[in-house]
UniProtKB/Swiss-Prot annotation:
Cytoplasmic topology ranges: 1-723
Protein name: Junctophilin-3
GO biological process, one term: exploration behavior
Its membrane topology: Peripheral membrane protein; Single-pass type IV membrane protein
UniProt subcellular location: Cell membrane; Endoplasmic reticulum membrane
Residue intervals passing through the bilayer: 724-744
Pfam families reported in the protein's UniProt record: MORN
Species per Swiss-Prot/TrEMBL record: Mus musculus
Length: 744
């Protein structure tokens, strides 16, 4: 029983149309994964039969199908190229026509696995043709190349080699390419005409100077040695001009060549061996009949111009190479051995031949082989002509099949509309992707625009808000704000835009309060720390850091008052500035049963070099609440090396200079905590604190000592600094010794 409807696949595709036994049957429209690609037409038990397939790029196929592949006959439109003909299991062939809609270049013949193979005819945009054998998309075997009149032939300037018949033709965007060309003038860019290869007067340069012997030239060319020439030599100047102009021709292509996208099949590295060519009449044509290898004239063959210039003999890569005979329009001949279009031994015009008997024998054999190859090539061209006519018939049938496929596609759209009126037909799958892509771009914009606002607004923590937690890299302490029960006094209103603050917090365990100390440092070029972004309800994150130069990690702990807070979503800014990593670990003192926060220092405990602090002692309480929130590790990047920001200990100025980079050219402003008073009664409120400012002092940030126990670790860590200095000095001495031994 046949029915129909709409079915959406998990991969984003959909089918709307008729089906039978759970398979597409009848007429319907199906889109590929994520809406890419679309087939509209007739179906038979889950497989396409006749219809139109459209790719997201706009390429289309109209024709018959079998077992999910293009099979039978159909028309493919791909860029500027259109293929009409037979298809076999998804590939072009056996007979078909591929044509460029822009300039009329085309191939008509047999195909195999999607490439020209067998016999066929290639027509170029200027009207020139090749008829003969093909193998793997290239001319190979025997064939005939016929050019158009010289005045109409395509001008070729590029030294690259491609053709509409080769594998590389897929990237030409429908441009017709012209092989079989050679440079016409050695002192100019690699200018040539499509189908013209013969070069007359190959000995014109040789006869100018005896010093420029052919054997010497061929030897130097083969060994790729530098030739010493006089700067005043005409040949030297012309060679330089040729090299310069060839480079210019590489980068600047004429509009004619650009429109045709035609290239030549010569190796232009040896363009200097080519010689000056006489002016060719605009009506002159050239024909090559013979062997081909790898899309080039190679083997034996005959090339002849309509003005009487003719060459019979051996070829290699579109050049005369081997034994052959050259006949000039005036009837004179030149025969012997050629290398890269240059006669290196044999009989020249008006010259006494050398070793005439042996050379003449080899030349005669080469000429006979060339004539035989020409005869075979003409036979192959006739076979190619018959294959061409058969391919044209298949192309006509493909046009008829394409029209039927379009009609089936129209019926399929009507059927899909009946089963699902809300179904929207799209020409290709691009529309299916665009909404999601645009949405993702908008999300990125929102995140990127919101980030600078948080960076430019460092504020003290207020209840119910998320602290910025951005502190300068060179600050001795990190910010670990606990959740206060009341709002602390606001920060001074007189600070500048470039001021940065760091907070230092101590917790009063019993009173559920905390004491915050605000440190201000001027200069806006600090590398800033940030909290990682957490979801609501996540435990508080604790930053962590590793000591410089492999020093042991000192532990210290903080705790909150039970408030869960999200962090500042700025984890990436720090990482981009420096490769330093930090790690914090939690630690509990063995001698203290309480797991509270860090204690404040006594005013007479240590004399700080950079900050002046005056604090009054806190009242000790009997009990301490348990730490209920696990600490999370945070990894961030430092600015110049490993810095132990989590170490609450004092450092000497000399150690700070070695381990900490200067924060900025501006001097930091030091704030002194004048007084800190606690009430006698335990109250659940924030401890009162005041801030007073002292004049700026030229100093570097230092770290505070929180526990007496870390004093022992301080000694061990500070003792490693001289060792590092000694190691660096020894390393420098070793490098200097190596430098002296090897380079002096």
């Amino acid at each position: 029983m046949s029915s129909g409807g709409r079915f959406n696949f998990d991969d984003g595709g959909s089918y709307c149309g008729g089906w039978e036994d759970g398979k597409a049957h009848g007429h319907g429209v199906c889109t590929g994964p994520k809406g890419q690609g679309e087939y509209t037409g007739s179906w038979s038990h889950g497989f396409e039969v006749l219809g139109v397939y459209t790719w997201p790029s706009g390429n289309t196929y109209q024709g018959t199908w079998a077992q999910g592949k293009r099979h039978g006959i159909g028309l493919e439109s791909k860029g500027k190229w259109v293929y009409k003909g037979e298809w076999t299991h998804g590939f072009k062939g056996r007979y078909g026509v591929r044509e460029c809609t822009g300039n009329g270049a085309k191939y008509e013949g047999t195909w195999s696995n999607g490439l020209q193979d067998g016999y066929g005819t290639e027509t170029y945009s200027d009207g020139g043709t090749y008829q003969g054998q093909w193998v793997g998309g290239m001319r190979q075997g025997y064939g005939v190349r016929q050019s158009v009149p010289y005045g109409m032939a395509a001008v070729i300037r590029s030294p690259l080699r491609t053709s509409i018949n080769s594998l590389r033709s897929e990237h030409t965007n429908g441009a017709a390419l012209h092989p079989d060309a050679s440079p016409a003038v050695a002192g100019s860019p690699a200018v040539s005409r499509g189908g013209f290869v013969l070069v007359a007067h190959s000995d014109s340069e040789i006869l100018k100077s005896k010093k420029k012997g052919l054997f010497r030239r061929s030897l130097l060319s083969g060994l790729k040695l530098r030739k010493s020439e006089s700067k005043s030599s005409l040949a030297s100047q012309r060679s330089k001009q040729s090299s310069f102009r060839s480079e210019a021709g590489m980068s600047t292509v004429s509009s004619t060549a650009s429109d045709i996208h035609s290239t030549i099949s010569l190796g232009e590295a040896e363009a200097e061996l080519a010689v000056i060519e006489d002016d060719i009449d605009a009506t002159t044509t050239e024909t090559y009949v013979g062997e081909w290898k790898n899309d080039k004239r190679s083997g034996f063959g005959v090339s002849q111009r309509s003005d009487g210039l003719k060459y019979e003999g051996e070829w290699v890569s579109n050049r005369r190479h081997g034994y052959g005979c050259m006949t000039f329009p005036d009837g004179t001949k030149e025969e012997g051995k050629y290398k890269q279009n240059v006669l290196v031994s044999g009989k020249r015009k008006n010259l006494i031949p050398l070793r005439a008997s042996k050379i003449r024998e080899k030349v005669d054999r080469a000429v006979e082989a060339a004539e035989r190859a020409a005869t075979i090539a003409k036979q192959k061209a006739e076979i190619a002509a018959s294959r061409t006519s058969h391919s044209r018939a298949k192309a006509e049938a493909a046009l008829t099949a394409a029209q039927k496929a379009q009609e089936e596609a129209r019926i399929a759209r009507i059927t899909a509309k009946e089963f699902s009126p809300s179904f929207q037909h799209r020409e290709n799958g691009l529309e299916y992707q665009r909404p999601k892509h645009q949405m993702s771009c908008d999300d990125i914009e929102v995140l990127s625009t919101g980030t600078p606002l948080q960076q430019e607004s460092p504020e003290l923590y207020r209840k119910g808000t998320t602290p910025s937690d951005l502190t300068p890299d060179d600050s001795p302490l990190q910010s670990f704000p606990a959740s206060p029960t009341s709002t602390p006094p606001p920060a001074p209103a007189s600070r500048t835009k470039m001021a940065h603050f760091s907070r230092q917090v101590s917790v009063d365990e019993e009173r559920s309060g905390d004491i915050q100390m605000l440190l201000e440092g001027r200069g806006g070029d600090y590398a800033r720390n940030s909290w990682g972004e957490e979801k609501a309800g996540a435990s508080r994150g604790i930053r962590s850091g590793a000591l410089r130069s492999g020093q042991p990690t000192e532990d210290f702990r903080t705790r909150g008052s039970g408030h869960k807070q999200p962090g500042n979503p700025k984890p990436r800014e720090r990482r981009t500035e420096s490769p330093t990593t930090f790690s914090w670990t939690s630690h509990h003192r063995a001698g203290n049963p309480c797991s509270g926060g860090p204690k404040l220092l006594e005013p007479d405990e240590e004399q700080l070099s950079n900050y002046k602090l005056e604090m009054k002692p806190l009242l000790r309480m009997d009990a301490c609440p348990q730490d209920t929130h696990p600490q999370r590790r945070r990894h961030s990047r430092g600015a110049g090396g490993d810095r132990g920001f989590g170490l609450q200990r004092l450092r000497s100025k000399s150690q700070n200079k070695e381990n900490l980079r200067p924060a900025s050219s501006a001097e930091p402003t030091v704030q002194k905590l004048e007084s800190l008073r606690l009430g006698d009664r335990p109250e659940p409120r924030l401890l009162r604190w005041d801030l007073t400012f002292s004049p700026p002092q030229k100093s570097l940030p230092v770290a505070l000592e929180s526990d007496e126990e870390t004093g022992d670790e301080l000694k061990s860590s500070t003792g490693s600094a001289p060792i590092l200095v000694v190691m660096v000095i020894l390393l420098n001495i070793g490098v200097a010794i190596l430098f002296i031994n090897f380079f002096i």
